[in-house]
Amino acid sequence: MIPDISLFSLKKNWDAAVAGLIGALLIYFFTRHGGIGLEPDSIVYLSTARSVAHGSGFFEFEGIPMTDFPVGYPLFLSIIIFISRVDIVQSGHIVNMFLYFSLIYLCGGIINHISTRTKWVKIPFLILIVFSPALLTLYTYLLSETLFLLMTLLFFVALHQYGQKKTILTLVVVALIAGLSCIVRYAGVTLVGAAGLMILLDKKLVLKKKIGHLLLFGTIGIAFLVANLVRNSLITGMLTGDREKSLTSFFENIQKYAYVFGDFFYFHDLPLAFVILIGVSFFVFYIYSHIIHFYKSNRYYNYWNICGTYFVVYTIFIVLSATFSRFEGLNMRLLSPLYLSCLLPLTFVTPWVISKLNGWKRYGLISVFVILFVVINYYQYKDNRVFYQAATEAGLPGYAEDSWRNSPILNYIKSDKKRFKEGTRIYSDGNEAVYLFTGLQADLVPHVESKGDYENFKEEQQNDYYLVWFYDCADPEYVSLVKLLKENYYVELASAPEGRLYFHPSSKVNQTK
């Protein structure tokens, strides 16, 4: 019998290694023009990593402690900066090339385990994974999901090993991976929940041993998260930053959840009822599969059941989180952990269903799967072509675009930073851009729903300050430029198509333009 871990060896997984190299090259070509993609969250990670690498602690670009995100990903980046002595803006694409290669290679090994008798299924699914826009749009950016998805696959492997051996060592490895994932993304708690659920429902584990394993796993699994939350609470009085109440209902989030799956597998153009039905069907299917594996305990810890259990736990977590807490709407990025946990078990389901049919029914079903594969790949190609054209012509969308690097307003600020008096505050609707391209610290303009923010800003009118305004960053949730110009006095220092730079002198507090 082939040793369990040998299916991850280069000899058995060479095709995944080739696919991984192709994936790494894709990241290189997508980032060749403007470097690693940068979103607002990326600037928080980047600035915090720089702060840690320079020995200043977990402080983000606004000069405040980072609490909206856990410390794991910035710590990971800071270690790379410290070892390489190269800033992550210059090396980020190389880091992501390595992470994407590793992700694809692990997928190949897992497929080897899931589909041991039907090797032909591996290549088509590797192609889907390598060229998936859902993954490429993550791994071309500086985002915590790039590390989190890899840790999720490592968790699958470790939990499978635990299921084979049931030793303390394998349990501790699972707990460490799950625990560390919690400080890469707070959603890492879903790994703790998935493993805890599987251990709890493990029929072969005697009660005394089960209780001991659950206590040990739970203690290690949540230790990192608890430490991170305690640190946040001691520093700011909040566990995970300032969280607002959700504006979307449970059913609205179910609809968004289904639409994201439509984006994953390109059925989003179907009528709404079908989109929701198909999206929810994945969830129901993996609940059913877990019940089946519960009664077939000899296969309880196979990769199919591990992926399916995680899929169910993460789905419940993310939909409920979006219902009770306000953050960006459910999208490919937030649901990216579901993509592989949904796709990998299908490498068993597809050939299994085909094997149950004979004659024209078998060939008919094979034809359907081939057509689906071709259609999905065609749409993936179309999406990737548009994405690649944008990346090669002007840089990846966001702060890696040429328009930001060539911004007259930012170049004006960089040309003579001395004009910005030390101690004089800077306000901006795009404070991430001010930090990234000038190195200066800027505060975000007040939120319209936060009376405290606006009162503090009004008190600032007694002092000199600068206002950097970018039209592309204007957000209805924050105070508008029209309101600022109407209620305060400003001297215009620079004007360009993308924005304006103003100075507010304290001596003109009671005047208006």
What spans do the regions from the language model cover?
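Perimembrane helix-loop-helix junctions
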Residues: 2-5, 10, 158-164, 191-222, ...
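Short acidic/glycine- and proline-prone juxtamembrane loop motifs at membrane-interface regions
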Residues: 39, 134-147
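Loop-to-helix entry region of an early transmembrane alpha helix in multi-pass inner-membrane enzymes
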Residues: 71, 75, 83-102, 123, ...
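Membrane-interface transmembrane helices that cradle and orient dolichyl/undecaprenyl
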Residues: 112-117, 155-171, 181, 205
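Signature aromatic-anchored transmembrane alpha helix within multi-pass, membrane-resident enzymes
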Residues: 119, 123-124, 176, 193, ...
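Membrane-embedded, lumen/periplasm-facing catalytic core of multi-pass transferases
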Residues: 371-433
